[in-house]
Amino acid sequence: MSTTKSDNYISELRKVIWPIERYENKKFLPMAFMMFCILLNYSTLRSIKDGFVVTDIGAEAISFLKTYIVLPSAVIAMIVYVKLCDILKQENVFYVITSFFLAYFALFAFVLYPNPDLVHPNPEAIESLSLAYPNFKWFIRIVGKWSFASFYTMAELWGTLMLSLLFWQFANQITKTDEAKRFYSMFGLLANLALPVTSLIIGYFLHEKTQIVAEHLKFTPLFVIMIISSLAVILTYRWMNKNVLTDPKLYDPALVKGKKAKAKMSLIESFKMIFTSKYVGYIALLLIAYGISVNLVEGVWKSKLKELHPTKEAYTMYMGQFQAYQGWVAIAFMIIGSNILRKVSWLTAAMITPLMMLITGIAFFAFIFFDSVIAMYLTGILASGPLALAVMIGTIQNVLSKGVKYSLFDATKNMAYIPLDKDLRVKGQAAVEVIGGRFGKSGGAIIQSTFFIIFPALGFVEATPYFASIFFVIVILWIYAVKGLNKEYQVLVNNTEK
């Protein structure tokens, strides 16, 4: 009897720790490996792209890249993707897009990166043009380091195309509903381990004691790892098409048919939906406020990080550490997030994100505005100066904002759709994705880049008071939107329960 109980306990424990059935490992493990490789590249690219742009062009250039290069490039990429889907099989579309990234990584690693003087315009000519046309100096400086700008753009597109689109489209295509409940949470846990692994890789290859290649080519091993990782993604995808999608026990094509496509709305239709429904408008405001507030702090933080770590190698190594912190915190929040949602009200759970942003934002900007006063009081108490402390608090703020995003923020936002009637729920979510997604991600960059065009003499250091003011206004609006949405939410929930 005791043996049976013990076996049952072990079986239940296994389902909690590893909810994948033995026969499903053939399907789950290759998909998890694919996601790990994609995220390994993603986190490596995120660390390197900022290191190149911030140290060689300036932190201010990031807002211009996001607004005027990345956003149009993403639109063009989606148009190309749709066209490819019309003329090729889905499997071949995956190969074409992944091979395009693979070819670019090889081009950058072995041609563009080793020969900056050969591929970039004369620095003196760029500087003289910047002085002659100060309102457009950041555009000119981006052109002056165009290969780094292209790398930044490709890094952003990797996350959009490879992770958000191709991987999840493939996963949704071949995963049954009952499998998804067990697979997807495990994908998140395993894939987030790629972030600390990235940190270890970057820390090793960029360390001053590591002498594998010439000093001016320190990043080459990282590019080679990304190329190998991209090849691994292609080969794993190929193996799955040959061995998993042909196994009737693991994949039934009939299940793919009949899946309803999500409602898609144009920009004008989305605006109409948001302005005519207060409830949907509140949800959109949450998403927009989150995106803008994160971008406003992130820009100032990266400029301070450059002051603390002025070289590409030092900056990228710090960003690698940041990725590790982000990975562990994301895993922790994924574990505790569901428990928080079960034990507190929707309002309390939804308030955690903006209040956390507000408190850490106040601390971050305080260390920037009152650095001399803080330095006077902290001398002899802490080894770190006010700059290092400001960067540390900015790091904590960014890590927490990303960790909370995937657990509490997204969960409470999605819970808000549940009490709506089916039509408003489907159309409202589509409207929020269009407006909230676009304006949230690019809103902060548009504010910053417009400010630098109008006031060309200012950089992040001089503009920080203005961006801090906008940040606090946005967060206060966010808190107002949470309170307003909670009132509407409670009314609908109570009506549903009656």
Curated annotation (Swiss-Prot):
Free-text function comment from the UniProt entry: Provides the rickettsial cell with host ATP in exchange for rickettsial ADP. This is an obligate exchange system. This energy acquiring activity is an important component of rickettsial parasitism.
Iron in keyword set: no
Highest classification ranks of the organism: Bacteria, Pseudomonadati, Pseudomonadota, Alphaproteobacteria, Rickettsiales
Protein name: ADP,ATP carrier protein 1
Pfam families: TLC
Similarity annotation: Belongs to the ADP/ATP translocase tlc family.
Main localization of the protein described in the UniProt heading: membrane
Residues spanning the membrane: 34-54, 68-88, 93-113, 148-168, 185-205, 219-239, 280-300, 321-341, 349-369, 380-400, 439-459, 466-486
Extracellular side: 55-67, 114-147, 206-218, 301-320, 370-379, 460-465
Subcellular locations according to the entry: Cell membrane
Gene assigned in the entry: tlcA
Residues in coiled coil: none
